[in-house]
């Protein structure tokens, strides 16, 4: 792992169902992070589309790689930064199957993706209605080190972070769209997951 690098945690506002505007905001934020000497920029869960889009998800979902990831790859290549963002992924194999996916791109293009394993179905959350759960941890070799990806509710379940660490992750990145009222839970959980796995952890 690189001895030292700078991460920009980009807690941007995402417009529901407006990919064009969200991509514009992502690009603007990446350019700003570049000026501030960041090496990696991390955006929230489903930052491409916004979190609450309900049935529009079927029109908004894309394959990965696909049109939007190609745009983000171009931005990453131009700025020479690593970018992590969330989006609804349309399966290239099974019709109408959609995943809640984290995507990692870098200076050389597309690096990899992770599909959220644990889908909440309580309170305002109805992810199981729209998404299929993923089933494997994801860790990727980068110029910065071995980066593992998890998404929001996954962090409540120790086995997800543990599997990610056992696959070699030196930095675990958790992207989230959780409301601020749950901040205390996530502050406790992020500390616990980092300590029990002796790994760095970044949370957006």
Predicted regions and their residues:
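Extreme N-terminal starter segment of soluble prokaryotic enzymes
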Residues: 2-9
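Short, basic and Ser/Thr-rich N-terminal targeting/leader segments
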Residues: 3, 77-84, 96-99, 151
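Active-site beta-strand/loop signature of hydrolases that rely on acidic residues for catalysis
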Residues: 7, 22, 33-60, 76, ...
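N-terminal phosphate-binding loop and adjacent alpha-helix
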Residues: 11-31
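Residue-level recognition of beta-strand->loop/alpha-helix junctions
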Residues: 11-13, 44, 115
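CN hydrolase (nitrilase-like) catalytic-core segments centered on the catalytic cysteine
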Residues: 64-84, 155-204
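Short beta-strand-to-loop element that shapes/binds the nucleotide-sugar donor at the catalytic cleft/hinge
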Residues: 85-91
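Active-site catalytic loop in hydrolytic enzyme cores
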Residues: 93-167, 180-188, 192, 197
